A protein has these predicted regions:
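Phosphate/pyrophosphate-binding loop motifs in nucleotide- or prenyl diphosphate-using proteins
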Residues: 1-134
Length: 134
């Protein structure tokens, strides 16, 4: 079994999938760290909702966000090795969720104040983390 640590010291750098190294303050590291934070925020929302449909959406989105994080954590060689990259089907999936929500709730004409219930508040936190990741 391999270890999660390398014992080589990092000198302020981290390895990308594919073998190259980048500074830990690079935009890629910041981006995939924020994506990881968004995945965790969605996990909190998942535990707080009772809706099987919302749970299914969240779980699917979390899995695809792991893929997005992997892409951000890859160099060119790593990208060639990755399978199942983020693509048009992922965009369509999200658009379908938005369309269904709009059918049920109508178009939003004003800002929604977070905090109606715990799961809604958690989803708003996740939304803000995702916006930062964008």
């Amino acid at each position: 079994m391999s270890n999660i640590y390398t014992k080589t010291g990092d000198k302020g750098t981290t390895g990308l999938y594919g073998g190259s190294r980048v500074d830990k303050d690079s935009l890629n590291v910041d981006a995939y760290g924020t994506v990881d934070e968004a995945i965790s925020s969605l996990g909190v929302a998942y535990t707080l909702t009772d809706s099987p449909e919302i749970k299914e959406y969240i779980n699917h989105i979390q899995k695809r966000m792991f893929q997005a994080g992997a892409e951000l954590a890859s160099d060119a060689r790593g990208m060639e090795m990755l399978k199942d990259k983020i693509g048009e089907a992922d965009i369509k999936y999200l658009e379908n969720i938005i369309d269904k929500s709009t059918e049920v709730n109508g178009l939003m004409r004003e800002f929604v104040v977070p905090g109606v219930n715990p799961s809604s508040a958690a989803l708003h936190v996740a939304r803000t983390v995702v916006r930062r990741a964008e």
